[in-house]
Amino acid sequence: SFQVTVSSLPKDIVRQSLKQLDSVITPDLKAAYKKHGLSVYEAITLASIVEKEVPKAEDRKIVAQIFLKRLAEGTPLGSDATYYYASAVYGGEPFPDLDSPYNTRMYAGLPPGPINTVSKTALEAVAYPSDTDYLFFVTGDDGVNHYTKTSAEHEQATRLYCKVSCATGYVPDSL
């Protein structure tokens, strides 16, 4: 982290932010990203999605692994956070069919850029994801993530654990 004052110029904030990021992304992390077929920029983009999807650090490695599997398979990431980001940036109501390159429910691959700031734990999660068979996750109304291996299990977990949030739509904490 770094300090910003009211008199800080935008270029100085960006410079400080990049310097901080450069100190976190070590050669080992860069090598790990490369093993996953990701550039540093792509890893930052994926980490930003992981960061926004799951605020709890202990869940990030599992979610990173799920998203990395989807990228490798060429299937959409399916992140609600990305279409909420698109609606906040480009205007309009957030919905899964929002036509934007940031909508990873609609388009496979990574969006054009990060959707959020990233933490060291999110960057490390992308570099060193969990090793599980999970392909899906849903965050329940209680904030607990439920991981599943099949689409049918995911639909059941959504019905059981996400009655309110999933009925009203994803509500981001901040964009």
Feature roles, as predicted:
Residues 1-175:
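Bacterial extracytoplasmic/cell-wall-associated proteins, especially those involved in peptidoglycan
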